[in-house]
C-alpha cells in the first residue's frame, strides 16, 4: 500500500542542494520513469535575509507541504500568500522571491 506522504521506487541524491548558507536546502528525487522532483526545507527569513531569491532553468510547480510563505514571481509587484496544500508555477528561465516566518517544507515538480 502506498502512502500519500511517501514516494516508492525512487533514487535520492546523497548530497543536498544547499543555498543561503544552509538556510534553504533540498534533495533531488529521481523516479523510475525519469521524472525528477526536489524535496526541500526553507528556514525562516530574518533581518539578514528578508526574502530568498531563486532562479529557474526549467518550469517548476512548487507545492507547499507544510508551513506558509509569501511568493513574488518575476515581473509581479506584490507577494502572494501560500500555505500547505497550495502550489505556484514558476516559468523557466525566470525567478521568484520567497519570504516566510516559520519553516516551510515543499516539493518542486520540475515541469520541463
Question: How should these model regions be labeled?
Answer:
Residues 1-39:
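A short, N-terminal "cap"/entry segment at the start of jelly-roll beta-barrel domains
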Residues 30-32, 72-74, 99, 111:
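A generic structural motif
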Residues 91-112:
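Ligand-binding loop in jelly-roll beta-barrel domains
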Residues 61, 78-79:
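Short, surface-exposed secondary-structure edge patches
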Residues 56-70:
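Short, conserved beta-strand element in jelly-roll/cupin
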Amino acid at each position: 500500500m502506498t502512502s500519500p506522504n511517501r514516494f516508492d521506487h525512487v533514487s535520492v541524491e546523497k548530497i543536498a542542494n544547499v543555498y543561503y548558507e544552509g538556510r534553504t536546502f533540498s534533495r533531488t528525487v529521481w523516479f523510475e520513469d525519469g521524472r525528477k522532483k526536489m524535496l526541500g526545507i526553507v528556514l525562516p527569513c530574518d533581518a539578514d535575509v528578508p526574502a530568498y531569491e531563486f532562479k529557474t532553468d526549467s518550469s517548476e510547480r512548487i507545492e507547499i507541504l507544510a508551513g506558509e510563505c509569501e511568493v513574488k514571481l518575476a515581473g509581479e509587484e506584490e507577494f502572494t500568500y501560500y500555505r500547505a496544500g497550495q502550489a505556484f508555477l514558476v516559468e523557466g528561465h525566470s525567478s521568484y522571491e520567497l519570504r516566510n516566518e516559520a519553516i516551510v517544507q515543499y516539493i518542486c515538480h520540475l515541469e520541463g
